[in-house]
């Protein structure tokens, strides 16, 4: 009799367990190319550039310091607001640089500093050498100017750090175009102490919006303040021209050569801070061809892979639509830039009253995703409308190329309506309300709803 009762209990327990674990949906998700206008990566035009003939998610612009700063602690943010609002209205995020001197343009030194007597050197290059035109280099050692730069950076950070309209900013402020040089008049550039104070000001107030510097510098550098161990990225503004290390003494200014000279911290910077830049203007457009015409052009993909670059200004593809083969190659190359996430599989288990979800993701790009954007799951109906959303604490930041798949998991309460016709989907939330969605390299991306990756049916 006892044996019969034991058997009955065993069978009942088995039936209860079977009733609890109702269905499991194990999905092998197919790969598909990701779009070239994923957010915070890719090729970047100047703001409002006519044509806009290549997919993009960001726009770049310069701003003159004197247009923004009217007194030691008096600022006019209207030009910045017009810029950011205009870019955001197109679903894009902004990269900007503020300058004090720009070859060929009038000085950007604020009027109150001119009236205080800050000296400005007017000079012109040999026309055979860029930058062409007249330059106005202020005395970067003048304490009044240095304090003004610190004041401006502080106000900028307090107002705009973490603003969802902003993608990145380049440090600017010092040197021609804000590029931290006054070549060939190196004697007019900012002394190291001024550079250090500018960097310290950025470090104090820009905690969320990434700041990028023009030149890597180690402790032993004679002309630049050491920055390899500071929380900044870099921008290579002679990309695919002065990028790869040639080993020649005359090319020691090339980007990868300067990285090596700055040490391991600079070489590994891309793991935690973004790399950007600009394709050298002489090779705009053609750099994407199988055989660029210009003899000095370096292989674009090799440069991407060795620098781990995330974004690049490249006006050549935005001035007019490229020929079909150039366009096709450029799209493929942009996919290699920055992050490129693929979800190979997902498992969805209905346990009666809740759903367990596990998802694997890999990064097949050349760099991580640097911003801490939120993520959420949703149950989508047949029309692609979310009938229920579940915020999840999953992180997509810090996943490096070549890392083992990152595993995400969550237990969710079942939606109130029957699950049979619902699809479980995932998205990364762009904090810019109408910003480009981050899209995965999967056929299920946007299948049931724009911006959502369909993981599988809710069992």
Which role does the model predict for each range below?
Residues 1-12:
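Bacterial N-terminal signal peptides that target proteins for export
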Residues 24-86, 93, 145, 151, ...:
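Non-catalytic accessory regions flanking glycosidase/transglycosidase catalytic cores in CAZymes
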Residues 27-145, 267-326:
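N-terminal substrate-binding region of glycoside hydrolase catalytic domains
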Residues 28-48, 88-92, 168-175, 182-318:
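Catalytic-core regions of glycoside hydrolase
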Residues 59, 87, 156, 169, ...:
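Conserved, mostly hydrophobic/aromatic
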Residues 125-145, 152-188:
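Active-site groove signature of glycoside hydrolases
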Residues 331-459:
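Extracellular/luminal regions of secreted and cell-surface proteins that mediate adhesion/ECM remodeling
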């Amino acid at each position: 009799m006892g044996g019969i009762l034991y058997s009955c209990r065993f069978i009942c327990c088995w039936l209860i367990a079977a009733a609890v674990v109702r269905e499991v949906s194990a999905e092998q998700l197919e790969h598909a190319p990701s779009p070239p206008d994923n957010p915070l990566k890719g090729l970047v035009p100047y703001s409002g550039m006519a044509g806009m003939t290549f997919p993009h998610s960001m726009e770049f612009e310069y701003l003159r310091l004197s247009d923004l700063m009217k007194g030691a602690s008096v600022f006019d943010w209207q030009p910045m607001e017009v810029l950011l609002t205009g870019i955001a209205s197109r679903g894009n995020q902004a990269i900007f640089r503020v300058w004090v001197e720009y070859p060929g343009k009038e000085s950007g030194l604020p009027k109150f500093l001119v009236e205080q007597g800050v000296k400005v050197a007017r000079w012109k290059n040999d026309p055979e050498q860029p930058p062409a035109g007249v330059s106005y280099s202020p005395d970067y050692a003048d304490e009044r100017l240095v304090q003004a730069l610190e004041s401006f950076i502080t106000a900028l950070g307090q107002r705009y750090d973490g603003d969802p309209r902003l993608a990145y900013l380049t440090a600017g402020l010092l040197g021609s175009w804000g590029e931290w040089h006054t070549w060939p008049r190196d004697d007019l550039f900012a002394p190291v102490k001024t550079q250090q104070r500018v960097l310290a000001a950025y470090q104090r107030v820009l905690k969320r919006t990434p700041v990028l510097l023009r030149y890597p510098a180690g402790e032993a550098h004679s002309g630049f303040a050491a920055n390899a161990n500071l929380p900044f990225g870099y921008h290579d503004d002679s990309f695919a021209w002065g990028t790869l290390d040639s080993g020649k003494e005359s090319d020691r200014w090339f980007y990868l050569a300067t990285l090596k000279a700055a040490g391991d911290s600079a070489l590994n910077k891309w793991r935690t801070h973004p790399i950007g830049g600009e394709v050298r203007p002489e090779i705009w457009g053609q750099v994407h061809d199988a055989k660029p015409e210009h003899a000095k052009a370096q292989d674009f993909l090799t440069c991407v892979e060795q620098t781990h670059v995330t974004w690049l200004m490249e006006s050549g593809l935005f001035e007019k639509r490229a020929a079909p083969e150039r366009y096709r190659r450029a799209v493929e190359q942009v996919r290699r830039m920055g992050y490129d996430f693929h979800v190979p599989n997902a498992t969805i288990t209905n346990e009666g009253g809740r759903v367990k979800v596990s998802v694997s993701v890999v990064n097949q790009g050349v760099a991580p995703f640097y911003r801490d954007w939120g993520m959420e799951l949703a149950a989508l109906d047949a029309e692609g409308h979310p009938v229920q959303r579940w915020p999840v604490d999953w992180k997509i930041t810090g996943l490096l190329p070549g890392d083992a798949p990152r595993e995400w998991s969550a237990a969710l309460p079942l939606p109130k309506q029957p699950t049979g016709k619902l699809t479980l989907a995932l998205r990364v939330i762009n904090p810019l309300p109408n910003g480009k969605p981050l899209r995965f390299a999967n056929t299920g991306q946007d299948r049931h709803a724009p911006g959502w990756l369909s993981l599988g049916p809710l069992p």
